[in-house]
């Protein structure tokens, strides 16, 4: 485990313990139902998380999105993070779908785009090799 992974591990422990929203939502992961399907080449994991309906049912029309403040720029005071490469902040996701669910936004507000950040994402997965990365933009 490298220094960054150790720092992230402590962040996860602290946030799940000290931040009520994170503590409650990580606690609700006990309600997740999981099935595993195995074939000769892979294991597929199917997950049903009843709490995800909140974000799945959120309004995403243009007017609703414009009316909603950026949740990375307007973070709760309790949400702590770890700075990564001066450009990113590694945060514990308070609405998890996995036991150790992180989110990695830029440290400044910018339109979501992946193209300029491919190399950074490769660096992140290299530095946090125990984690999977997906882009949700």
Regions found by a protein language model. Name each.
Residues 131-137:
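A short glycine-rich, hydrophobically flanked beta-strand micro-motif that places a catalytic Asp/Glu
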Residues 1-116, 128-131:
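Active-site microenvironments that recognize anionic phosphate/pyrophosphate groups
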Residues 120-122:
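A gly/proline- and charged-residue-enriched helix-loop-helix capping module
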């Amino acid at each position: 485990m490298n220094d960054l992974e150790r720092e992230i591990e402590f962040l996860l422990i602290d946030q799940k313990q000290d931040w009520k929203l994170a503590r409650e939502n990580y606690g609700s992961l006990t309600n997740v139902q999981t099935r595993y399907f195995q074939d000769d080449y892979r294991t597929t994991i199917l997950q049903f998380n009843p709490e995800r309906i909140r974000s799945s049912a959120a309004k995403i029309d243009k007017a609703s999105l414009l009316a909603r403040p950026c949740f990375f720029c307007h973070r709760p005071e309790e949400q702590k993070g770890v700075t990564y490469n001066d450009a990113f902040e590694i945060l514990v996701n308070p609405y998890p779908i996995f036991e150790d669910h992180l989110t990695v936004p830029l440290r400044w507000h910018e339109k979501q785009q992946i193209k300029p950040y491919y190399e950074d994402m490769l660096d992140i997965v290299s530095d946090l090799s125990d984690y999977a990365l997906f882009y949700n933009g």
